[in-house]
A protein has these predicted regions:
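Nucleic-acid processing machinery
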Residues: 1-20, 34-40, 49-62, 66, ...
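Hydrophobic or amphipathic alpha-helical targeting/insertion segments
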Residues: 76-81, 85-103, 179
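Hydrophobic transmembrane helix module of multi-pass membrane transport proteins
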Residues: 139-142
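P-loop/Walker A NTP-binding region and its immediately flanking N-terminal helices
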Residues: 440
Length: 452
């Protein structure tokens, strides 16, 4: 596909969800970026303009953002990597778009740090940028996602560094913004480079199980469809395999091998109204035996990032457990796209009350005293388990840390929540199949680390 064909694809994507977009300015932004990036090349050998085109495609296809966001995505590297200036961009488009481009450029300049205080300052800068215009971080996360998708062209050291940074900064922020689809892909791509052996084992085993599970999901979906149709409930049912990092984390939290984990797939039922959600829950519990302690009502008590759904885990008729998530169409869009969906509703005049769902940003910015500990707690809570996976040199107290020099797959360890690894000995079982039990010794004074 030529670069002009890529741009035509972008135009068609935008036209599908926003036929009133300013296509003249979008094309002018593309031509400006193409001219200024000129013969610049990526590590893959492709013309550099393919990258902003891909980022704009993500912004449009995944997030359905407005014309200004598309323009800014196309131009997001011109101030940083060419001789174009803020004034040039403002004259071409508008001061608002120039502000977005400058905001993304500022985030690009943030250097990855291994010291906790430096890392917290970097996170705070990102939060400050978010508080000014949420579109800055949405474009930046899209930028990082495309870079992770093309990470195979980087050196092994760069792959690990960027994957650590993605796992520590971008995936958690995507989670806090409710952008689950992008969070999952960021996590999976990071895991691919942080633990390539573990990632490949999970993917290969999932591929081997896929025909069996596809058939099982098809039968189960037919059962749910039939019963809901009989009840006269308008609905859509989606079935999916769980993503690799979710399974990887479950293996550690439950101290199991992949062969010992059975709930590898889940269903979503999307309906029109909240009352339908609870009616569907009753139908599901009538069809399948619910597993005690596995029901959560996130409709009555939404998550801090605005996520709403009913969650239940049931035992299937064939003896295999699976999760069912039940939500309305609007809840589904917010669950998939997070703050991007909220922002779109706000633009359409439907956003009353959504600002409060992101009060955590302002709260952290306004209350600097103690904010570090609060943000650390927010990060830790992302994992929702009593054990934390760490991929790096040390795990600071209370933080799900992925920092420091990454020194190979055997450096992967699990730590109990709130425990420092300084002068500690942690016994753990590497949960991937056919691996032996190991212990990690950290000797801080002599800066020696041994994997036994």
């Amino acid at each position: 596909m030529t670069i002009d064909e890529q741009f035509e694809k972008l135009e068609n994507t935008v036209r599908e969800y926003n036929p009133g977009a300013d296509f003249k300015r979008i094309r002018e932004s593309y031509e400006f970026a193409k001219q200024h990036h000129g013969e610049q090349r990526r590590k893959s050998g492709e013309l550099y303009i393919t990258h902003p085109l891909a980022v704009a495609q993500i912004v449009a296809e995944e997030l359905h953002l407005d014309s200004e966001s598309i323009e800014a995505a196309l131009l997001h590297d011109v101030i940083e990597d060419t001789d174009a200036t803020y004034d040039d961009v403002a004259k071409l488009t508008s001061p608002t778009v120039a502000d977005l481009v400058e905001g993304v450029s500022k985030l690009t300049r943030i250097q990855y740090a291994t010291k906790e205080d430096e890392q917290m300052e970097n996170l705070r800068k990102m939060l400050i940028a978010m508080s000014k215009d949420i579109r800055v971080i949405l474009i930046k996360i899209s930028d990082r996602l495309h870079n992770m998708r093309t990470m195979e062209y980087q050196t092994p050291a760069k792959q690990k560094q960027k994957s650590l940074e993605t796992m520590e900064i971008y995936a958690p922020i995507a989670h806090r913004l409710g952008m689950q689809r992008m969070k999952w892909e960021l996590e999976d791509l990071s895991l691919k480079y942080l633990d390539p052996i573990g990632y490949d084992e999970i993917v290969s085993k999932l591929d081997a199980k896929r025909p069996e599970y596809d058939a099982l999901m098809s039968r189960t979906q037919a059962q749910i469809d039939q019963r809901l149709n009989e009840m006269g409930i308008k609905h859509i049912v989606y079935g999916r395999m769980k993503h690799p990092y979710s399974i990887y984390r479950k293996m550690f939290s439950q101290n199991k091998s992949l062969d010992e984990i059975f709930d590898l797939f889940a269903f979503r039922v999307v309906v029109d109204t909240v009352s339908d959600c609870y009616n569907v829950l009753g139908v599901i519990h009538d069809l399948y035996k619910p597993i005690l302690g596995r029901f959560k009502d996130y409709i009555g008590t939404p998550k801090p990032n605005g996520y709403q759904s009913l969650h239940t885990t049931v035992m299937g008729n064939e003896g295999i457990p699976f999760e069912v998530q039940i939500r309305t169409t609007e809840m589904h869009e917010i669950a998939e796209y997070g703050v991007a969906a909220h922002w779109k509703y706000k633009q359409n005049g439907q956003g009353a009350g959504t600002e409060g769902r992101y009060e955590w940003v302002r709260r952290l910015l306004e209350n600097q005293e103690g904010a570090d500990a609060e943000l650390l707690a927010e990060e830790t809570d992302l994992f929702g388990h009593d054990r934390i996976l760490a991929f790096g040199e040390e795990a600071v107290e209370g933080l799900s840390a992925f920092r420091g020099e990454f020194f190979g797959v055997d450096s992967l360890f699990a730590q109990p929540r709130g425990v420092s690894l300084r002068d500690q000995r942690q016994e753990f079982r590497h949960c991937l199949p056919d691996r032996v039990d190991r212990s990690l010794v950290v000797e801080v004074e002599r800066e020696e680390r041994r994997i036994l």
